[in-house]
Structures are given as structure tokens and as C-alpha cells.
């Protein structure tokens, strides 16, 4: 397919029709609203224009509140849903109907507010539980924590490290006063909890003696009464707090019946956010508003028909070359190339004046993935997973691209599995041995085997890499000729092709004159001359070395990179065979099955991701490096935006 052609739209409309106009543009879903270029307007007009106000901040806040409320309901009152269930559908008119929006937002705010109370209750509960834990060492002490002793005696509660013995503490205390006693209340793994009783006039000296043993005075805050009394009070507070928390959670659960309405209103508010963002990009004066944006060229007739119903003036024009970096990019795909959207989006969209890589990449990506995975069993799993997901979930946009890519890659994997004779490795042959079948039972036909034909697979991978890279060069040549730069195509790609042809002829001992490979020499001369064009003096010499180095290392590196196809094919087959062999050691089908399931689950998961990553590298680095011009900005039209619902198609 191709990159969608864009038109620049400039529009002036009467203010009274602004809301209706934006609503209509949103329903069309093919216009990206941008801020007008005021520099192109006359100074007299610019001084009267002002940016339109919008409530985008409030809309974003309300949208976040609605989404948070839905997430809280899912947390406190989870809803059972079918596995791989599709999103519910609704009409676009329902999304644009905001008659119940205000009440639903209040419900969402109430849910969020109650959750904040629950979180405060949790924090308070943690504080009370911590206080109870701090009192446990003192439960055996029948003395008030806030006690002040008697008229002459002081009682001080504290603790020392568990490694300090009570005898050492008592001895240190006896050295400063004989009228004092240290009482052990309790001990745990880290601390020893003590009560010091002495005359008040001896307290300072006693504490100084105990500090040698890292004695610390216990702090109980505003606690009154014994530790046991305080613990009972804290237990009562915890019970009351748990009761209040339970009531709060029940209140949230009672609002679970509003879940679908909250989701619907979240989508309504999501759409209002898009509307408010577009409104905030407009400029206007007392009676007129100015709009500028990018529209899909193929939608121009539909747009013009809609605009004729409004009191407005507009202009549609093609972007100038200097505007290309600002023009948004949208790829137009069919069912096959749409699957590669996730790959292109992960890397980078092409520039507006570039080339759509999806149709050029699709056959190679799918073929390479199948070669690297190459197992009928794994291919069947991928096909079934993709078909079931598309049938049950009815995915759209990015999810649809993923399912389609999984399906096509699964088909390729299955076909390559037929050619290599792999069905979960050699599982059938191992099962045959366990069941006592004759030798050769379960061994599938294969055109080539990655286990025995390693060099054949490696050479084949290199040949595919050569075809892949040359395809990229052909695309580069076509694009350069289209832009009137045939000279660069001749001296750059042309010289490399002459060198490749010359190398093949030299290998076949064809075309040499006096032992000199003429075609190869001509190609090298073309390459050196093309690489030094435009350079002068010493620059020509450096250009020659640079061209030689980049060509030799670049091409050899790129070609060798395709050896990963062989490596992954071999690794997947070896790992599968190893697990099958381990499962068959005991010669028992009951032991083979769990080893088979665990081993192939791991191997499948590893290869599913590994093949994707390495295939992605071959496309984005080796292939795209020959022709791709990235840096495109995604086309983001003003449209009905949803998170929880799908819009029913007409």
C-alpha cells in the first residue's frame, strides 16, 4: 500500500457554529486539528485573534476520576468475565450523549473519596498495630507506663541489646549505688527489656552507669495505665476501625452496579478531552474562529460536503516540501500489511516523503520468522491462538495487528516445519520408541534438517540475506530516481551491483582478461569514484579509505547477521529434541507427558519472543538501513475516543 496523502486545511467559521462544526469534524474522524500559523496572517488580523479557551484541564481531571473509580470497583468488587471476551459495543450517539455525565462523575468522586477513607483507615490501623507490637514486651509488667514512681523512688523503663547479660548490668549499677535494682521484664532476639528502680537522687548516676551497656529509655507517648490496659484499649480501637473500614468497602461494593455506566461515561469524557484539546488549538475573535489542520486527501469530497452545511470559508492545499517534517503520517494497509503496523510503529514511522515499509517488509518478516521457528506443532499453536483471539475478542487497531501477525507467522512456522520435518521436535519418534514401535516410526519427511544440514541452512540464510539487502537497494534506487537523484543511485547502489556481479564472475572464472577480473575492477573504480565525488584535495584520499572500509565491513557484517536465522532454527530444534529425549529416558508415557509439556512450553515461549526480536533486527537495521527514511509523526485525528467500549460499525 502507501502513505496516505494529506491536505492542509485552513478554515474560518462563525463563532455560533463552532461547537457544531467541531462535533461534525469529530464524527468524520479524518482531520487533525493544529494551531494556525499566525505568521502567515497580516499584522492587522493577528492583533485581533486570540487563542480560544477550553476546559481541557477539567475534562482530563474528570476522565482520570472516572477511570480511577472503575479501577477501584475492579479492586473491591471484581467482576467475573469470560476469557478472551470482546469489548461491548455501543453507538457513537450514545458516547456523545452526556445527559447522565454529571451525576456519574459525582458517583465516581464518591467512590474515590470513600477509597481515600479506606486508605486512611489502613494507615491508622498500621499505626495502632505498631503501637500494640511496641507494648508486647511490657505486658508482664503490672506498672503504669506513665508512672512517676513514689515520693522518693524513681522507676525507669528501658532496654539494652539482647547480647548484654543482666549480671553485667546489675554489677555496673552496684558500683554507683547499692540502693537500686534492675528488673528483667522480658526479652526477645534483639532487645532485653528492663525496669530500673532507685532513689531519685541516684537516678542520674544509675543512668550513666547503664549507658555503658547501651541502655535506652523507653518512650510511650501519651499512654496511660499499664501495657495490658493500653493493649485492650488499642484492640477495641482496632475492632472499631475494622468495622468502619468494612462499612466503607461495602459502600464501594454497593456502587458496583454503576460499573458499566462509569465505563461508558469514562469513554464520553475521553471524547470530551479530545474535543477540548482541539478547541484549545483554535484562534478567534468576537464573531469568527480560525481552524487549521491536516486532512486525509481521499476524504476531501466528504469533508467539503460536510463543510458546505456551515457558514464557513475554507482552503485545501497540498503541503510544500519544506512542510514535510510537520505533515502527519498514516499508513494505508490491507489485511496482510496491516499486521506489520506494530513493527513499524515500534521502530519509527516513515517520513511523509518516504516509502511505506509494510508491503516491502511483510513477505520477508513472515518468511524469516517461519524459518527461525520452523516447527509444525508451534505453528499450529500460534494459528489456533490467533484465530481464537480474533473470533472471541474482535480486536481492533494495535490488538488486531498483533493477532494478524501471530496468525501469518504461525502459518509460515507451520509450513517451514513441514519442510524441516519438525513436530514438537522429534516428539513422534520418541513416543514411538516408548510404545515399542519399529525404528523409523514417527519420523517425518523433510526437505532439509537443521540438525544434519547445518551448512546448507547457513548458506541458504546468507542467500536470503543477499536477496533481502538487494531488495532494499532496489527500493532505494527507485526512490532516488523519483526524486531526480539518479546519479547517486548509479554511483552508490549501481557500483555495488557491478562489484557483486564481478565477484560472481571471478568465482566462476568468467570475464577475466589476462587474469584480471575486469567487471570487478570496473565496479571498484565506480565505487571509489562515487565515494569521493564532491571531495577535494586530501579529502579524496580519506573518502577512498572511508568508502572501502564502510563497504567491506558493512556488507560483510550485514550478510553475516543473517546467520541468526540458522542459529535460531538450530537452537529451537536442539532444545525441543533434548526435552523429548529427557522425557523418553524412563521409557514411560506418563513421565514423558509432563516433561514434554514443561519443556516445550519453555522452548515455545523463548522462541516466540526470540524469533520476533531477531527478525525485528534484520528488518529495522539491515533492511531499513538500505532505503528507509524515518522520523514521521503519527496522524492523530479528532475522533470519538474510547477505552472501554468499541464503536459499532455502520
Positions of PLM-derived features:
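Long, charged N-terminal accessory/stalk domains
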Residues: 1-361, 389, 396-399, 403
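Conserved, carboxylate-rich catalytic/transport cores that coordinate ions
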Residues: 2-8, 16-22, 26-33, 300-650
